[in-house]
Amino acid sequence: MLRTLRTSQLARSGFGTPSFGLRFNSVGRAFVFSQTGEPKDVIQVLEYPIEKPLENQVLLKSLGFTINPADINQLEGVYPSVPPKSVQINNEDAAIGGNEGLFQVLDPGAKSGLKKGDWVLPRKTCFGTWRSHALVEADTVVKIDNTDLTKVQATTVSVNPSTAYEMLKDLKEGDWFIQNGGNSGVGRAAIQIGHIRGLKSISVVRDRPDLEVLKKELTDLGATHVITEEEASDKLFSKQIKSWTGGKIKLALNCIGGKSATSIMRQLGAGGSIVTYGGMSKKPLTFPTGPFIFKDITAKGYWLTRWADKHPEEKAKTIENIFKFYREKKFVAPPVNISTLDFSKGNDVVLSEFLDALGKAQKGGGKKQLVQWVEY
């Protein structure tokens, strides 16, 4: 059942409500949840009134937001970080969904340090990007230089490219890495960032009818080799991998788990590391003992949220470096499926359209789901 709500009981730090354009209307909209469970059952659309910013606040409009696996996990209640419940609806605490998005300044407070028209990104995670407008403290966002940037590039920079950039930062020119999920958002970003930095890569993908098309697409992005999961797990094919790399793969990036993770771990050279940043298969990690003893392999996890919230200034530098790659035409944005929400339509229609995008995100398929509001 679709749920639409209206409220005037708002936390000033959480909501602001200008029109979507540069003029002011009466309401903004947000996708919120007050309990966890099946995403389509817990998401509600909230309509909220306009408030003017105080001197240290800023009024924002959304230029787009994404739906990432972490967002879905937060709705399901299986993610360690959760957005704050900063608004009351029907006497229940509710949180705004979304961690990644791009905003534009509509009305800057006198001491905000921002100006009308500026593009900004959330400084930390759990910002609540799934809303048309936001009234926030100015120090919770970071201004970006939007010169030669598209909205898609800026909207999608904070999660996948930043994750890839940080996981590869300790490798040196000429080093090898191997990754599963080579067609994923992080995988594509890692291929490109690695290529820019002079790294060599092997990307593992699932077999499919258009495999050769995908292989060409990824090698055009900069992948040194693209192989299938079956090849990665084949002990005979491991000899081919060793002939390419000299047995000196330093890093394995794992976003799948299960047998796929085991396969790429086996390809590591002495002193190599496998870093797990996701678990799409929902299968546990099972590694043989030998490589850990005789090849001094290490295994660890990487969680962008922890790093980004602990080091927001470093995160800002990482994002600016990725923007530099975009401006130099060295980096390509991930494939996206853009869903548009028409602000002139009723709440039931808007919620239905959002749930359709959410369903596509849950199914996966290689394209990031990006949502934009239609201006009017």
Curated annotation (Swiss-Prot):
Its EC number is 1.3.1.104. GO terms for cellular component: mitochondrial matrix; mitochondrion. This is Enoyl-[acyl-carrier-protein] reductase, mitochondrial. Belongs to the zinc-containing alcohol dehydrogenase family. Quinone oxidoreductase subfamily. The lineage of its organism: Eukaryota, Fungi, Dikarya, Ascomycota, Saccharomycotina. It comes from Yarrowia lipolytica (strain CLIB 122 / E 150). PANTHER family: ENOYL-[ACYL-CARRIER-PROTEIN] REDUCTASE, MITOCHONDRIAL (PTHR43981:SF2). The active site is at Y79. Keywords: Fatty acid biosynthesis, Fatty acid metabolism, Lipid biosynthesis, Lipid metabolism, Mitochondrion, NADP, Oxidoreductase, Transit peptide. It is found in: Mitochondrion matrix. Residues 1-12 form a transit peptide. Homodimer. The keyword NADP applies.
